[in-house]
Each structure stands twice: as C-alpha cells, then as structure tokens.
C-alpha cells in the first residue's frame, strides 16, 4: 500500500512545500539573467527610437523639398507672420487689434450689381433691351 501511495503522489510531495509558500529554489544566475534581459530590452528600445528618429528626419527632408518646390510655408511660419502683421498694425492703436482679413475678401469692385443687371438685359429680346437701356 505504501508503494502505491508513493507512486501516486510521486513528485507531488516535493512540490507541496512550494505550493504552501515554502522556500523556492533560487537560481544563482537568476539575477544575472534578469539583468541581461533588462539590458537587451533597453538596447532594443534605443534601437527602435533611433530608427524612428531617422525615419522622421527623412520624412521631414522630403516634406521640406516639397515645400520648397511648391512655395509652401510651414504652418508655424504662417502663424508667426500673421501674428507679426497684427502686432505691427496695432502698435499705434489704442483699441484691440482687428483680425486679419483673408486675401481676396473685399477686393471685388462694386460693379457687381450693374453686371448682374446687364447680364439679365442681354437675354431679353431686342425691343425690351432698348427699353431698359433708356
């Protein structure tokens, strides 16, 4: 009977102490292995960051080439120029600075009303055109 019990429990009796919170076997090289693993992780992270920085630098060079080719300014440069223009306009003013008017707004002449009327008159028959022109 003892033999059967030993065979059934076998190595479980050795592990019982560990399961109940007993002392675990400590690997003498565990600290060294953990340190090496941490170093490898740190090194991999540094390599990843360096690769990312290199790719970003290449992208920025490409973006700058496109900006130069098409005469596009960076967003920061445009904002700085707009801010400087607003500050320059408001130096002698006692009121708050006005918002900059976008280019193209208000540049049209006041001939729009007449041009619309002229356009409508063009589509009228000849005698009616003469009436409206007088």
From Swiss-Prot:
It is found in: Cytoplasm, Cytosol; Presynapse; Perikaryon. GO terms for biological process: insulin secretion; modulation of chemical synaptic transmission; regulation of exocytic insertion of neurotransmitter receptor to postsynaptic membrane; regulation of synaptic vesicle fusion to presynaptic active zone membrane; synaptic vesicle exocytosis. Signal peptide: none annotated. One of its GO terms (cellular component) is perikaryon. Pfam families: Synaphin. GO terms for molecular function: lipid binding; SNARE binding; syntaxin-1 binding. The keyword Transport applies. Its main location: cytoplasm. Keywords: Cell projection, Coiled coil, Cytoplasm, Exocytosis, Neurotransmitter transport, Synapse, Transport. Binds to the SNARE core complex containing SNAP25, VAMP2 and STX1A. Positively regulates a late step in exocytosis of various cytoplasmic vesicles, such as synaptic vesicles and other secretory vesicles. Organizes the SNAREs into a cross-linked zigzag topology that, when interposed between the vesicle and plasma membranes, is incompatible with fusion, thereby preventing SNAREs from releasing neurotransmitters until an action potential arrives at the synapse. Also involved in glucose-induced secretion of insulin by pancreatic beta-cells. Essential for motor behavior. Belongs to the complexin/synaphin family. This is Complexin-1.
